[in-house]
Amino acid sequence: MRDVWYSSSYLLDRKQSMNGCAKARFENYKMQPVEFAFMPEFKGKLSQYGITPDRRTPSGIRAAIIREKGTNGEREMAYSLYLAGFDVKDVTMTDLISGRETLEDVNMIVYCGGFSNSDVLGSAKGWAGAFLFNPKAKEALDKFYAREDTLSLGVCNGCQLMMELNLINPELKKKGKMLHNNSHKFESRFLGLTIPTNRSVMFGSLSGSKLGIWVAHGEGKFSLPYDEDKYNVVAKYSYDEYPGNPNGSDYSIAALASADGRHLAIMPHLERSIFPWQNGCYPADRKNSDQVTPWIEAFVNARKWVEAKMKSVSYTHLRAHETCADL
């Protein structure tokens, strides 16, 4: 019955989707269920992470959302960071270009999703140019990444920006690229992600999980010049075939992290999936009891990492002061 209902859509899709994707979608739509596998310690409660939506006092842990003309995912991202315990500031490219903002007082920056500069010349090309060809913005970015107490996250358009600026794998001679989806269509759907064992600040504790997440992009294909083992892969689409792999990414990669695990670029929108009610589907035995999904843990991990760094720096300064006093 469902095949009969779907057949008209398939006939229309054949005239729109490229590279045989319409046929693959029709053949696989009922073969790729979104699977969930949570870590045993996940309870689904805010109290598990010591967080509350009612917080009204600053935590002192600062994150900045960086946005450009056409960014449209900053509200969900700001709330995800706030709920996890960050104090969040809004930074526009104009702030960086003019020198009003230097990023010196923040430990985490996030590039949000959207369509910066309407994707003219390609996704994130103009946004990258705003950093590369404006001295004050470039200086702020370079100084931020030169520090050892910083994290960064790029989602969707922000992921494309990080790849364009070569912020994830600067140690490799050849730079990876983000290309148009194989279907040559904008892909928007709720699908499954698998988190492999990985060494990253945000996703390390989620290793072994299978989670649902939203994708919404037209140029989300990771095209990578080296073998998979050269990269710190932190998330994969749960299926290699379209539409489970919505863009044809090499090795079914959905997210990459830097070699040290501090900087993460991901195409799907984890900030749009932190609550069960945001998910297109969720385990029936948990959807009425869980307050949050495991995706919130990624943001909490980031906040805890920064907290630990700040305490370490404070302790080092204290010991240095005591040593000077003893002399």
Residue ranges of predicted features:
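Amide-donor transfer/coupling interface in amidating biosynthetic enzymes
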Residues: 99-101, 142-145, 175-314
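Glycine-rich phosphate/diphosphate-binding loop of Rossmann-like nucleotide-binding domains
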Residues: 67-68, 72-74
